[in-house]
A protein has these predicted regions:
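A surface/extracellular/periplasmic glyco- and lipid-processing/surface-interacting theme
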Residues: 147
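Short, low-complexity N-terminal tether/leader segments at secretion or assembly junctions of large
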Residues: 1-39
Length: 277
């Protein structure tokens, strides 16, 4: 393309050291030039127009934590997420119960989708149809990160998904989807954590920690921490340089609360990039 120097008031027609410069552009998979800066550049990634790039938005809420308790921000109060349940990959089972754990058939016939990773840490999905108060799957999972229901009405029961004897997913009554601030980066991809947010119910406060277990390590360690209070509004942090999270690494957002019946939420956004790029 023709280039013009506003400073020298001449076209860059001759090839000299002062006239040579480099123009770098970013294109989608169809060759269309796209914006490489700012929030608008992420729209093409979310739309699937950039090969090898994808996004995941994870969000969770713990309903009502007890005073001076701690746990993962997911659908079960005062409980750390049972990562050890995945030491042996297995198929899953579902039971539908009342809020106190009594089996119930109110959601007979509904469809439940479970998303996660298989024994090779690759994306898989299983679909369950509740018969009475239970269902059994066929897909083997090494990790799970989301479940949701089909239908025109919300679930009337707690939908509890188990791996052997451990509950690893729960859809609380009326929510139609899990609310869990955990995630595992799939095989063949690297995650780039862009931002995180957290809130507390009014008159509640908590310490919220992002724990990361990097693949190949046995324990989680803190990757970010925040103090969150209901009277202070939401905590929001956008990383100036995204945090790199290697494939097969686990994220677990946890809260330690100081008030009773504290509802705490957390969410984060990750861009996933194929390792071969």
């Amino acid at each position: 393309m023709a280039q013009f120097s506003a400073h020298r008031q001449e076209w860059f027609g001759s090839v000299t050291n002062s006239n040579i410069f480099e123009v770098i552009m970013m294109a989608d998979k169809d060759g269309n030039i796209i914006n490489a800066f700012g929030l608008s550049s992420n729209i093409n990634i979310a739309a699937g127009l950039v090969d090898g790039w994808a996004t995941i938005h994870k969000f969770g809420a713990v309903p009502a934590m007890s005073q001076n308790s701690s746990g993962t921000i997911w659908d079960v109060n005062d409980t750390l997420y049972p990562w050890d349940a995945f030491d042996t990959p297995s198929a899953l089972t579902i039971s539908t119960t009342t809020s106190n754990g009594t089996l119930s058939s109110l959601d007979d016939g509904i469809t439940v989708h479970v998303l996660g990773l298989d024994e090779n840490f690759e994306e898989v999905e299983d679909t369950f149809t509740i018969s009475g108060n239970s269902a059994t799957g066929t897909v083997v999972f090494k990790r799970v990160y989301r479940a949701y229901i089909d239908g025109t009405t919300a679930n009337q029961t707690q939908i509890r998904v188990s791996n052997d004897t451990d509950e690893i997913l729960r859809i609380n009554i009326g929510k139609s989807q899990t609310l869990m601030s955990i995630y595992t980066v799939p095989a063949g991809k690297t995650g780039y954590l862009l931002q995180g947010v957290s809130t507390c119910a009014a008159n509640a406060d908590a310490t919220v920690d992002m724990y990361v277990r990097y693949f190949g390590q046995d324990s989680f360690r803190i990757g970010h921490t925040a103090e969150v209070a209901g009277v202070g509004g939401q905590y929001s942090y956008q990383f100036g340089v995204p945090i790199q999270i290697p494939e097969k690494s686990d994220l677990d957002i946890r809260a330690e609360v100081r008030s009773n019946n504290a509802r705490v939420t957390a969410a984060f956004d990750i861009v996933l990039v194929d390792n071969e790029i």
